[in-house]
Amino acid sequence: MKRPIDWREDRSAVREKVAESAHCVLPIVLIVVLLCLTAAPMKPDLLLSFLIGGVMLVVGMGLFSLGAEQSMTPIGTKIGTALTRTKNLPLILGVSFALGFAITVAEPDLQVLAETVPHISSTVLLLTVGVGVGLFMVVCMLRIVTGANLRWLLIGCYALIFLLAAFSDPDFLGIAFDSGGVTTGPMTVPFILAMGLGVSNIRSDRRAEADSFGLVALCSVGPILAVLILGFFYQGSNAVADLSSASFGSSTAIGGAFLASIPLYLKEMAISMLPIVAIFFLFQVTLLRLPGRSLAKILIGILYTYVGLVLFLTGVNVGFSPLGAELGAELAVHGWLLVPLAMMLGWFIISAEPAVGVLEKQIESVSAGAIPGKVIQRSLSVAIALAMGLSMLRVLTGISILWFLVPGYGIALALSFFVPDIYTAIAFDSGGVASGPMTATFMLQFVMGASSALGGNILRDAFGVVALVAMMPLLSIQAVGFVYERRAKRTAAAPEQYGDFDIVELWEDAA
């Protein structure tokens, strides 16, 4: 007799995921409320809409995380394994492109960025980034099959990126690098990793599993290249970012704004998720043929993902982000105090990201416990605090983002020659961990608000904050790996120490 789906277990999982997302969002909400009550006066209706948006964000992120875990990860693994069994390389590459495109278009962080960019149509940006990820999913699969070295692939890709950046429209620079950061979000990362692990089974050598790392790093390159190339051909509009202060007037108007937005996002997310669902059902009737219970669990996961995305985007766009921009504008009068304030927000953002815990366990496992999780968390907190400080420095001075990205990536790629390959792969993968939902939804709006209030160029000075946040873990994790590897080598080279109960031969008997 088939065991029915345990709904009590499902409810428990929902509560757990909502609690995780509350842990992620709550520190930012508390800091913002404290600032609104002391240093940055806000209209009560705007603060109330922010709090309602925060609740929707928490519930939406929780449902989405559970849904992605129950649907996107198993879909990626099962399709990857099924493709491997066919031994058909053109089919593997074609499906990888289609799935990379489809999963990216539904990525919530990318949806938020596309709505924020003023001079590029959101549809054009979504399609461009989707094509970029799809093409580099093909590159990822070829790398797994052939065992190509990740370091040299990354060096070649970033050399091409900075060559294009030197000649591209400055208005596209920050957006291009931000696109690479937000693409590796909570929808895309589990799917890419799962599919890569499934396809890596095509090889039986020791490096096969290690080569399944680094997929996120390569898929982050695709959107940057795609948007930079778009800048050479696309005539953007003259629109400017809409940072006008939201005003609701009454509590019923706030409720009306949220209720009016829900049908819009129900339609948008249905269109965005349709390709993923269609591809899955095509595989279900041809190669997978999952049993009823497994299929039902995946379908329930897809429903959770859909509802979570709708709540997430409604909460972000109606309530959460508008106050971020307004807060940045209010605090801009304090000038250079913006730098330490942004650093404090950066510290709390990364400390609260639920995906950081997964990264800590991954590195502890790879280092056989030599690198404690707390060391990784501290290094990431310092790195993201510095990234936010540098972002605000750009707003205050107008320095081009290339002055930070070129040396940053140069040092990160140079470090890859001095640490084991696995650390490089994990470090480049971890950029998506740092540039999570809080950076895309709140911090970008905060920086845009400050830039607008100071009379800066939002496209050139504010965009790029996600890129800096995504870059810093490449440096911090490899630096930690380098220090611990050196320490391990010194320990191995040290003379043997005798234990308390070892027998020590002081002389040898004459032969």
Question: How does the language model describe each region?
Answer:
Residues 1-94, 98, 275-307, 311-313, ...:
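N-terminal alpha-helical transmembrane segments of multi-pass membrane transport
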Residues 1-2, 140-154, 171, 203-248, ...:
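Juxtamembrane and boundary regions of transmembrane helices in multi-pass small-molecule transporters
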Residues 1-21, 25, 76-90, 204-215, ...:
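Intrinsically disordered, low-complexity non-transmembrane regions of multi-pass membrane transporters
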Residues 15-21, 42-52, 84, 117-126, ...:
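Interfacial loop-to-helix junctions that mark the boundaries of transmembrane helices
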Residues 24-39, 53-63, 95-102, 132-143, ...:
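Hydrophobic core segments of alpha-helical transmembrane domains in multi-pass membrane transport
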Residues 34-48, 68-76, 102-117, 136-147, ...:
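Transmembrane helix-loop junctions in multi-pass membrane proteins
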Residues 49-52, 246-355:
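Transmembrane helical segments that form the transport core of multi-pass membrane transport proteins
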Residues 80-82, 89-160, 339-416:
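Helix-loop-helix junctions within the multi-pass membrane cores of secondary transporters/permeases
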